[in-house]
Structure formats: C-alpha cells, structure tokens
Amino acid sequence: MSLTSHIVRTLFTIGDLKRDLGWVPPTDVEAIENVSYGSCDKWHLLDVYHPRKATGPLPVIVNIHGGAWVYGDKKVYAPYCMYLATQGFAVVNASYRLAPKHTFPAPLEDVGAMVEWVVDHAEEYGLDVSNLFFVGDSAGAHLATAYTAVQLNEAYAKSFPGIKVDERFIPKGLLLNCGVFDMEVEWKKQGRALTPFLTDLLGEKPTVDAVKQMSPAQFITSDFPPVHLTTSNGDFLRKHSYRLKEVLEKKGVEVVFKDYGEKKKPQGHVFHLNLKNKVGQECNADQLEFVKQMMKK
C-alpha cells in the first residue's frame, strides 16, 4: 500500500468517527443486515433499510460509498442511509472490495452485482425498482457514474466484461456528491504525485488507457439519466463537479447543480454526510426533493 493510501485510510477513519460520535439508530427504521450479494464473505454484504411502518413496495436508493476506493464500508454509512430511510425510501447500503488488495475494476463489478441483487430480490424486500436511484459520494459518485455509463455506452461496456448490461439496471436518476469523474485530467495535472495512488488502484503503474478507463465523464451519452450534482466551496474535488456539469449539459442530460457553502462558513468534502450540519441537511433535503420530482415522470 502506498503512503497516500495509508494516509487516506487513517484520516478518513478519524474524521468519520468524530462526525458520527453519539449517533443512535432511529427507532422508526427497520434494518435487514448482512445480506450476501456475492461470493466474498467479507465485502459482498449489504443492508436494507425500510421505514418501520411502510407498506407496499418503496422507491429504492442504492448507496455507493466513498473512501478513495481504499476505505469505507456499509457500517460507516449506516447513519446517512438510515436517515434516507426515515424519509420514506427503501435504502440499500452495501460494502464493496477495496484497493490495493482488490484493484479496479473490482469495485465497479461489485456495484454491478449489488444492483443485480436489488433487481432480482425486489419483490422479496419490498423494493420498487421502477423508481431506482443511485446516491454516491467521492469515489462512490465515480462508481455510480461509471456503472451507469457502462449500461448506456456499448463501447465503454466492452472494457468491463465482468459487468452485466441490462436495461433493468439503469437508474431513474443519480445523486452525485463531491465526486471524481475524470481521472485522466487529474493524472495529467498531478503527474508523479498521483502515480503511487493510481498504482494501488490499478495494481500496476498507470497507463493512459487504464486511467482513461477510470474516467466515466468521457463516456457519458445523451441518454444518461437525470443527475443532481453537488459540490461545495471546501471540496478538494470541486473542479470535477464543474467539469461533469459541462459534459452533462453538452450532452443534453438533465442536471441540477448545487455548490454549497459561504466564504465565512465553508463546507468541506462530503459535508452532507454530517447529519448535524445544517447545510448538509439542506443538501440532503434538496436531493430528496429531486428524487420525488423524478418519480413523477
């Protein structure tokens, strides 16, 4: 593991523990935990959250967590995902394989497996997959975008033979928070500084072709689903969201773009995960309103 990956894991662990200190699971959410969606006993596990008094199939939000592809799991995202469930949604909160032990495209293949599980088990778990949405932050936003692009771009899909393509797996909309969407641009900008980290992700020294394959912004088509795209004035990946906004607009894709934070009250990377943060609460409310509007279409 590179020093960069080690630092990321350490800092993210400390930050997440501090953010969620004192959190108590809501009593009005039912959690079905540790359901297997693949062959890896450690990583291919997901939870399904429902509002406790809900009846009938519910619109479903699949959460794809962030963590720079080297950190994170469903436990870290339980507070955020259970909050979403309190708002009337079924929420699928999954872990996936991490680098450097599991290199790209392993996490993307896992997204494919979790979405396939959702569709195949919709009736059993009360999931309305006609209203299927993805939410992802940071690396999770990247994976959500890449997976959707694979479903809609035949040429891009050929790069990932381990991912099943099926129109049932295309989400009705995506909620993308503080994401990274074009690794090729980032690599050209940072050069050697980013190479050790990319080596962790890819399992070998990066090449132009390999890094381009990790850049879903370059493979978006005009039939991409509507997107609610979020960044903030303290987000170190902020430029990625602006670039993706331009791509989506040029392709004619419906996009709602929000840049949160004020000069005196900056908002950091993935600020929306802090359920105590009023600006984060505003962001989450905005995104769920977007989902409700998409459900009417």
Feature annotation, model-predicted:
Residues 1-297:
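Alpha/beta-hydrolase superfamily serine-hydrolase fold, recognizing
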